[in-house]
UniProtKB/Swiss-Prot annotation:
Residues 1-20, 76-98, 163-168, 237-250 are cytoplasmic. A motif (NPA 1) lies at residues 83-85. One of its GO terms (cellular component) is plant-type vacuole. One of its GO terms (biological process) is water transport. Aquaporins contain two tandem repeats each containing three membrane-spanning domains and a pore-forming loop with the signature motif Asn-Pro-Ala (NPA). The chain crosses the membrane at residues 21-41, 55-75, 99-119, 142-162, 169-189, 216-236. Residues 42-54, 120-141, 190-215 are vacuolar. It is found in: Vacuole membrane. Belongs to the MIP/aquaporin (TC 1.A.8) family. TIP (TC 1.A.8.10) subfamily. The modification N-acetylalanine is found at residue 2. This is Aquaporin TIP2-1.
Length: 250
């Protein structure tokens, strides 16, 4: 069984840990700048028209590509979490200590906030869009949607990046993570906004000064990420036994 490790402050303030926090800050800043920037660009190009299908696809693709890059550039330094829900899920599965995870959260939230204020500045003060549950849906539906799509994201992180049995699959981890996020935004964007990432929702909320319904984007992703970590960490990584399929079985 995987266990949660509290860790020590000495380890969390080592040079390697400080580098990891900086890497998380930079990766999250770049991801949020591109992701939120794509939503701002869409609003400008369409004169604030309602989101349509081409716009949803463009924003989903932008988030997927940006996360692919953000994870890849941080992978060898911090693991490329770029998301408090990913960090939480990995902590639940014993892949990162709680203390280090808290500092990851701080770096991620600061990176997202910095990205959104930079966007507000370079766009001449254009509105920074925030996540919200679609009209006609309740907060509970939004939470459930975020639980499901964040579970899919963190499960993908475990399968392609955290699992020691991943083998050559690890080389495509950033791509797989980017793809699942893009796909989930296509599926959930019109309903919950498709956040999967408390930091992605936090920065825009701070920059816009609008925290209405913001709790949905903490509760849903943290439950989904925690469940993925609990299940994958204990069921699929809890045993060292692994029998790969023979090549003839593919």
């Amino acid at each position: 069984m995987a266990g949660v490790a509290f860790g020590s402050f000495d380890d969390s303030f080592s040079l390697a840990s400080l580098r990891a926090y900086l890497a998380e800050f930079i990766s999250t800043l770049l991801f949020v700048f591109a992701g939120v920037g794509s939503a701002i660009a869409y609003a400008k190009l369409t004169s604030d028209a309602a989101l349509d299908t081409p716009g949803l696809v463009a924003i989903a693709v932008c988030h997927g590509f940006a996360l692919f890059v953000a994870v890849a550039i941080g992978a060898n330094i911090s693991g490329g979490h770029v998301n408090p829900a990913v960090t939480f899920g990995l902590a639940v599965g014993g892949q990162i200590t709680v203390i280090t995870g808290v500092f990851y959260w701080i770096a991620q939230l600061l990176g997202s906030t910095a990205a959104c204020f930079l966007l507000k500045y370079v766009t001449g003060g254009l509105a920074v869009p925030t996540h919200s549950v679609a009209a006609g849906l309740g907060s509970i539906e939004g939470v459930v949607m975020e639980i499901i799509i964040t579970f899919a994201l963190v499960y993908t992180v475990y399968a392609t990046a955290a699992d020691p049995k991943k083998g050559s699959l690890g080389t495509i981890a950033p791509l797989a993570i980017g793809l699942i996020v893009g796909a989930n935004i296509l599926a959930a964007g019109p309903f919950s906004g498709g956040s999967m990432n408390p930091a992605r929702s936090f920065g825009p909320a701070v920059a816009a000064g609008d925290f209405s319904g913001h709790w949905v984007y903490w509760v849903g992703p943290l439950i989904g990420g925690g469940l993925a970590g609990l299940i994958y960490g204990n069921v699929f990584m809890g045993s060292s036994e692994h029998v790969p399929l023979a090549s003839a079985d593919f």
